[in-house]
C-alpha cells in the first residue's frame, strides 16, 4: 500500500507524490504515518519531514510550521514555508548555525533574545536535515 503525499506552501507545491511512509514533526512530537493510518488533523511544528519513497529511499524536507490532514491514505500538509533537504547547502547551514549561536549569546532585551532563539532553532533544524542518516532497509 502507499500514501499520497502533498506538501503545499503559499508560494509553491513542494511535494506531490506517492510514498510508503512519512515521519512528521507536530506540536505534540513526531508521528510516523503508514498506510491506513487513523484519520487525524494536526498542527505541524517547525522541524524535519522524513519521506520514504516507494523505492525505499528516504528524503528529508524541512517544514516551518503549518497544518496536516491525514485521511484515507492521503496526507495534505499546508505549510507556512518548506525546504527540501537537497536544496540546503550543508556549509551554509553550518555557518548560519554558528552565527545564530553567537547572536543568542549577544542578544540584549527580551525581543532580541526571542528572535535569536527562533533563528537558532531554525538553523539547528536545517543542519539536522542535511546531516540526517536514514535507517537501513
Curated annotation (Swiss-Prot):
Additional note from the record: A stretch of the chloroplast genome is duplicated within chromosomes 1 and 6, resulting in the duplication of the gene. The expression of these duplicated genes (Os01g0790900 and Os06g0120500 respectively) has not been demonstrated.
Cell compartment(s), UniProt: Plastid, Chloroplast thylakoid membrane
An example Gene Ontology CC term for this record: chloroplast thylakoid membrane
Listed name of the protein: ATP synthase epsilon chain, chloroplastic
Domain of life: Eukaryota
Provenance organism: Oryza sativa subsp. japonica (Rice)
Record note on quaternary structure: F-type ATPases have 2 components, CF(1) - the catalytic core - and CF(0) - the membrane proton channel. CF(1) has five subunits: alpha(3), beta(3), gamma(1), delta(1), epsilon(1). CF(0) has three main subunits: a, b and c.
Cited InterPro entries: ATP_synth_F1_dsu/esu, ATP_synth_F1_dsu/esu_N, ATP_synth_F1_esu_C, ATPsynth_dsu/esu_N
Function: Produces ATP from ADP in the presence of a proton gradient across the membrane.
Keywords assigned: ATP synthesis, CF(1), Chloroplast, Hydrogen ion transport, Ion transport, Membrane, Plastid, Thylakoid, Transport
SUPFAM superfamilies per the UniProt record, alphabetical: Epsilon subunit of F1F0-ATP synthase N-terminal domain
A Gene Ontology BP annotation from the UniProt entry: proton motive force-driven ATP synthesis
Alphabetized PANTHER family for the sequence: ATP SYNTHASE DELTA/EPSILON CHAIN, ATP SYNTHASE EPSILON CHAIN, CHLOROPLASTIC
Membrane topology, as annotated: Peripheral membrane protein
An example molecular function term from Gene Ontology annotations: ATP binding
